[in-house]
């Protein structure tokens, strides 16, 4: 669930470019639905914004669970990021999270030299009953295309899906405040998505997260991105131990 919320609340290939489209100032709202059998109830909301500022994009995600869902699992997340427009390179990532009874504050600052990428990571973590948490700092290193749980939302929108073949697979590294993971993205072609009396023609992609050892770190996720010039992810879906979470776009401006 945490990966899905981070993408809402979320490709190494020389033939693909993350500069196919540029982003104007925008705001996208989502509703987060919990589905299990006949149960289909809104569990939360999320809002993503991106602002042009000189050579950079300033990004932000806020997400919160609805009051009834707070009784089972509270979510109050804020993610902030800075992306360099040239090359679409993440420069800074921050996540302030209250999930369940746990509080986390992650910061990643990027450094690049040629194809090498370093992430200077700080994590502060505490439980609800702790007055002061623990702080850990470490450095993550990798090579090639690298994103985080916020910048990947915009990176996947900027790819040229029209040049991809069905079932084509792309790989890249994704940083969190704790570790790096391999993100595998598979393109499934175009599909129609309908909800709230509207329908959208979309590119369908799926995500798989694995550790350095190749072990899956979460269940697969799916996203549907409109084929028009706005490239809005109108639907995201992830499987939970019981039921699944679906996120639907409810507004764009």
Question: Language-model segments: what does each one mean?
Answer:
Residues 114-176:
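Active-site/ligand-binding surface loops and adjacent short beta/alpha elements
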Residues 9, 21, 86, 145-147, ...:
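Short non-domain terminal segments
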Residues 8-17:
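Hydrophobic h-region of N-terminal signal peptides that target proteins for export
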Residues 19-112, 158-253:
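Acidic, serine/threonine-rich low-complexity disordered tracts
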Residues 1-4:
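Positively charged n-region of N-terminal signal peptides that target proteins for export
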């Amino acid at each position: 669930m945490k990966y899905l919320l981070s993408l809402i609340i979320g490709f190494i290939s020389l033939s693909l470019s993350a500069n196919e489209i540029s982003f104007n100032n925008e705001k996208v709202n989502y509703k987060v639905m919990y589905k299990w059998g006949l149960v289909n109830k809104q569990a939360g909301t999320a809002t993503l914004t991106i602002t042009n500022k000189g050579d950079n994009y300033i990004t932000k995600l806020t997400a919160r669970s609805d009051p009834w869902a707070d009784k089972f699992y509270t979510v109050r997340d804020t993610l902030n990021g800075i992306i360099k427009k040239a090359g679409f390179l993440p420069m800074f990532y921050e996540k302030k999270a209250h999930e369940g009874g746990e509080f986390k504050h992650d910061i990643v600052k990027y450094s690049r030299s040629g194809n090498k990428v370093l992430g200077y990571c700080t994590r502060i973590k505490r439980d609800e009953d702790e007055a002061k948490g623990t702080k850990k700092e470490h450095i993550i290193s990798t090579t090639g295309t690298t994103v985080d749980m916020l910048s990947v939302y915009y990176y996947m929108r900027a790819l040229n899906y029209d040049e991809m073949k069905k079932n084509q697979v792309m790989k890249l590294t994704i940083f969190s405040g704790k570790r790096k993971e391999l993100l595998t993205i598979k393109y499934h072609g175009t599909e129609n998505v309908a909800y709230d009396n509207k329908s959208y023609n979309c590119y369908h992609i799926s995500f798989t997260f694995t550790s350095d050892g190749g072990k899956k770190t979460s269940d697969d996720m799916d996203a549907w991105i409109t084929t028009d010039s706005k490239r809005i992810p109108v639907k995201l879906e992830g499987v939970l131990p019981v039921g699944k979470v679906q996120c639907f776009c409810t507004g764009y401006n």
